[in-house]
């Protein structure tokens, strides 16, 4: 069972130091993908080992998971993967993080915390203010991927992104995954669980225009 953490807690107001890209990666000029709410990062470990031409950053709000993931990166000496602890909204709004967007080509939101109760919707990761930040920071052609097994959450995220005129939807059937951050279409642990249990998956791709 995934433990939900309130992203609006004051505990996340203080941002950890974000090192320069050259400190994070072996090749700091490679295309960069952000995975927001990466949990233990197994999805990113698989991607980083398969697709070494890309760099990956995972942002996760549960500190214990980030500490474990960082230790694994060091133990395995992986040069194209980095993890950051904290609230993604706060981190990416922080002035010290602005340089990250220079190389970002895509961002994924895979099975984020649904926060089912209406009074908790403000805790959901995708909010209009966050989309405005991405709209103002991402380069044209950058991609956003959303995926969830909760229809209400999908509709909520889709509505917010679609209402931002700087993003438009892409037909997944026309999308060339071979040139993306996930050429082998690696699946997260949650997606594997959903498939095994024959549950619905709702997903969409958007491009910055």
Curated annotation (Swiss-Prot):
Enzyme class, UniProt record, top EC level: transferase
Binding site for substrate: 117, 149
EC number: 2.1.1.33
PROSITE patterns: SAM_MT_TRMB (PS51625)
Keywords: Methyltransferase, S-adenosyl-L-methionine, Transferase, tRNA processing
GO CC entries: tRNA methyltransferase complex
Keyword Amino-acid biosynthesis: no
GO molecular function: tRNA (guanine(46)-N7)-methyltransferase activity
Pfam families: Methyltransf_4
Catalytic residues, chain numbering: 113
Binding site for S-adenosyl-L-methionine: 35, 60, 87, 113
Catalytic activity: guanosine(46) in tRNA + S-adenosyl-L-methionine = N(7)-methylguanosine(46) in tRNA + S-adenosyl-L-homocysteine
Family matches, as Gene3D superfamilies: Vaccinia Virus protein VP39
Metabolic or biological pathway: tRNA modification; N(7)-methylguanine-tRNA biosynthesis
Domain of life the protein comes from: Bacteria
UniProt KW S-adenosyl-L-methionine keyword: yes
InterPro entries recorded: SAM-dependent_MTases_sf, tRNA_(Gua-N-7)_MeTrfase_Trmb, tRNA_methyltr_TrmB_bact
Family membership noted in the UniProt record: Belongs to the class I-like SAM-binding methyltransferase superfamily. TrmB family.
Protein function: Catalyzes the formation of N(7)-methylguanine at position 46 (m7G46) in tRNA.
Protein name: tRNA (guanine-N(7)-)-methyltransferase
Lineage: Bacteria, Bacillati, Cyanobacteriota, Cyanophyceae, Synechococcales
